[in-house]
Amino acid sequence: MNRVILVGRLTKDPDLRYTPNGVAVATFTLAVNRAFANQQGEREADFINCVIWRKQAENVANYLKKGSLAGVDGRLQTRNYEGQDGKRVYVTEVLAESVQFLEPRNGGGEQRGSFNQQPSGAGFGNQSSNPFGQSSNSGNQGNQGNSGFTKNDDPFSNVGQPIDISDDDLPF
């Protein structure tokens, strides 16, 4: 089994390129904090190179930037090539199958939560036409503010009014 799950921050903006056949490929590096601290009490980070293909690559390039918090699910792969000096160069990287955006874009709440770039268990050949997993119905967009939530979705909108609940319904 070859499975990698990472959560970290991008060290620089993703690099989006296209193959000669027009297939999009994005590369980026995630800084992932280690689970333990060093002798000085600081948590060190590992810098993991990641690659993602096709429409997901374009989405990553459009919506993530340096410092963005992202979750990556994929597999580890090693490839090699001959460098300019004639020596064999080995590269180990994560081939991302899905990337989740774990914070709002620009910190201003323009986007909601996380966007799953690919349905769970789907392969590259089975990409969703709607990579954000959102309904394309735009009927409620007029009621949305910057947070992306409709005004009726606020569970605390009745703050300050008494709540009618029986003592028998309370768990304590």
Swiss-Prot record:
A motif (Important for interaction with partner proteins) lies at residues 167-172. Keywords: DNA damage, DNA recombination, DNA repair, DNA replication, DNA-binding. GO terms for cellular component: nucleoid. The keyword Nucleus does not apply. Residues 125-148 have a biased composition (Low complexity). Gene3D superfamilies: Nucleic acid-binding proteins. InterPro entries: NA-bd_OB-fold, Primosome_PriB/ssb, ssDNA-bd. GO terms for molecular function: single-stranded DNA binding. Residues 103-172 are annotated as: Disordered. Residues 1-103 form the SSB domain. One of its GO terms (biological process) is DNA replication. The keyword Ion transport does not apply. Plays an important role in DNA replication, recombination and repair. Binds to ssDNA and to an array of partner proteins to recruit them to their sites of action during DNA metabolism. Homotetramer. NCBIfam families: PRK06751.1, ssb. HAMAP family: SSB (MF_00984). This is Single-stranded DNA-binding protein. The gene is ssb.
